[in-house]
Amino acid sequence: MAGAGSAAVSGAGTPVAGPTGRDLFAEGLLEFLRPAVQQLDSHVHAVRESQVELREQIDNLATELCRINEDQKVALDLDPYVKKLLNARRRVVLVNNILQNAQERLRRLNHSVAKETARRRAMLDSGIYPPGSPGK
C-alpha cells in the first residue's frame, strides 16, 4: 500500500497520477487560509478608505482653522492646533502607506500561491512528476 507521501502504482508497476500527501496538505492549508486572507484584505481595504477620508477631513479642518484664525479680530493663536492636525495627518498618511505596501505584498503572495497551485494541478493531471518526486 502506498504511503501518504508517495504516488500510487498500478498493477503493471507504472505510476498512477494522483496528489501526494504533501500536495494535499498544501492545498488543504491554502483552502483553510483563503477565507481569512480574503477577510483581512477586505478589512485593510476598508481601513485604507477610511484613512483617506480622515486625511481629507483633517485637511478641511486645518484649512478652516487657518481661515478662522485670519478672520478673527481677537488674537487667538490656533497655529499649535493646526500643527497638531497636520502632524496627525502625516501619521495617517504613513500608516496608510504601510497598509498599502502590506496589502500589495499579500496580493503578490496570493497570486504566486495560486499560480503554483495551478502549475502543480496541471502537472498532476498530465501525469508528469517533478524531479525528485516519489512518483518518478
Swiss-Prot record:
Phosphoserine: residues bearing it: 10, 50, 126, 133
Primary residence: membrane
Modified residues (N-acetylalanine): 2
One annotated GO molecular function: SNARE binding
Region entry Interaction with TOR1A, spans: 83-136
Record key words, sorted: Acetylation, Coiled coil, Cytoplasm, Cytoplasmic vesicle, Exocytosis, Golgi apparatus, Host-virus interaction, Lysosome, Membrane, Phosphoprotein, Synapse
Subcellular localization, as worded in the UniProt entry: Membrane; Cytoplasm, Cytosol; Cytoplasm, Perinuclear region; Golgi apparatus membrane
A Gene Ontology cellular-component term: synapse
Coiled coil: 37-126
Tissue distribution: Expressed in male germ cells of adult testis (at protein level).
Post-translational modification Phosphotyrosine, affected residues: 129
Modified sites of kind Phosphothreonine: 14
UniProt subunit comment: Component of the biogenesis of lysosome-related organelles complex 1 (BLOC-1) composed of BLOC1S1, BLOC1S2, BLOC1S3, BLOC1S4, BLOC1S5, BLOC1S6, DTNBP1/BLOC1S7 and SNAPIN/BLOC1S8. Octamer composed of one copy each BLOC1S1, BLOC1S2, BLOC1S3, BLOC1S4, BLOC1S5, BLOC1S6, DTNBP1/BLOC1S7 and SNAPIN/BLOC1S8. The BLOC-1 complex associates with the AP-3 protein complex and membrane protein cargos. Component of the BLOC-one-related complex (BORC) which is composed of BLOC1S1, BLOC1S2, BORCS5, BORCS6, BORCS7, BORCS8, KXD1 and SNAPIN. Associates with the SNARE complex. (Microbial infection) Interacts with human cytomegalovirus/HHV-5 protein UL70.
Protein function: Component of the BLOC-1 complex, a complex that is required for normal biogenesis of lysosome-related organelles (LRO), such as platelet dense granules and melanosomes. In concert with the AP-3 complex, the BLOC-1 complex is required to target membrane protein cargos into vesicles assembled at cell bodies for delivery into neurites and nerve terminals. The BLOC-1 complex, in association with SNARE proteins, is also proposed to be involved in neurite extension. Plays a role in intracellular vesicle trafficking and synaptic vesicle recycling.
Protein family (similarity comment): Belongs to the SNAPIN family.
Protein name from the UniProt record: SNARE-associated protein Snapin
